[in-house]
Amino acid sequence: MRLRFWLLIWLLLGFISHQPTPVINSLAVYRHRETDFGVGVRDHPGQHGKTPSPQKLDNLIIIIIGFLRRDTFTILFCTSYLCVSFLKTIFWSRNGHDGSTDVQQRAWRSNRSRQKGLRSICMHTKKRVSSFRGNKIGLKDVITLRRHVETKVRAKIRKRKVTTKINRHDKINGKRKTARKQKMFQRAQELRRRAEDYHKCKIPPSARKPLCNWVRMAAAEHRHSSGLPCWPYLTAEALKNRMGRQPPPPTQQHSITDNSLSLKTPPECLLHPLPPSVDDNIKECPLAPLPPSVDDNLKEYLLVPLPPSPLPPSVDDNLKDCLFVPLPPSPLPPSVDDNLKTPPLATQEAEAEKPPKPKRWRVDEVEQSPKPKRRRADEVEQSPKPKRQREAEAQQLPKPKRRRLSKLRTRHCTQAWAIRINPWVEKKKKIKKQNKTHAPKTN
């Protein structure tokens, strides 16, 4: 009983701890390959990644059940095994390998034999960690990764909202584009799209027919005028086919005869003998007698005078007789201009009543006004200059008498103002007084 109890505890401790027993490891690998739920379930070091066969697993289970010999323990063991398998199936794997494909398993096994575990980056510590025992990527790192993603998404959404709000605010305040700039921008965009469509879209045959005809005629004219096989810018399908069939026109160099040498022929070509041609015997041909032809007797026909043939009767035979007879004058048909030679009487009277026009004098007949003669400086009468009177002859004005300050009215002025009194004002006052005294009194 004690042995069975300690065996059960040993199995449970091996399940909970990070060092599982070979039995549990083999069971886990057989049922759930490459998974560990909270435990470091991996192949036994002695197995080197090989999965035990189902026969070995069955033998181990039979040995355990036969060794325990109790139905209760067997039921408990099977129940715990099924629970562990169920939990491993539900929960995620910590090292990220759930055995979904054989390729991943092989890659992980080859990498495990080289590095003894997978290496990845922990989102919490930002360090590279491996799937060794005690240093696994756990649930905490998964939660941290999820929080990090959520924070990043929130920041992006907030940035988009702020940008939208700013753009809308600027558009309201008129900081984005004015109506004129917006119209010009839209026009430029439309022209750019039309240019792109022109290069991208194909012209339908219905719209291409008149273009082909015009292109064909223009290319033909260009070809005949310039001597080129075709116009390189006119590349319609019909024009290509037609121009491809026709031979190229003769150029200036090809139009020269073969026996004549061009000016552009290099001097080296003159030294080599030319190939034999049909024109080599052209000198012998004029010496040989020509065969008789119809034109040989042409000179004889020209020397023999032709017999006169009578002309047919014509209307002009009696023209000489008619010229000597004078023609009678033929009266002209009446017209409206016959009465314009003699003007009517009313017009003559109106012209007689008009005043005669003044006679226009010639330049020679007009009396020119005499020009004033230029006199010398001696002949000009000088205006008499005013005589300068002497100082003695000039009327001497009486000098104003100096009065004392005591006689001045010092009621409203000070001594300084009394000194600055103008003497000429006093003189004028004195003259006025004298005039009043000498003036006769009238009754």
Curated annotation (Swiss-Prot):
Superkingdom of the source species: Eukaryota
Biased composition (Basic and acidic residues): 351-393
Primary location recorded for the protein, binned into one broad class: secreted
Composition bias, Polar residues: 252-262
Residue ranges, compositional bias (Basic residues): 399-412
Keyword Iron: no
Subcellular location as annotated: Secreted
Keywords from the UniProt entry: Glycoprotein, Secreted, Signal
Annotated region (Disordered), positions in chain: 242-262, 330-413
Signal sequence coordinates: 1-18
One cellular component (GO) term of this entry: extracellular region
Residues with attached carbohydrate: N111
UniProt cross-references to Pfam families, sorted A to Z: NPIP (PF06409)
Family: Belongs to the NPIP family.
Protein's UniProt name: Nuclear pore complex-interacting protein family member B15
Native species: Homo sapiens
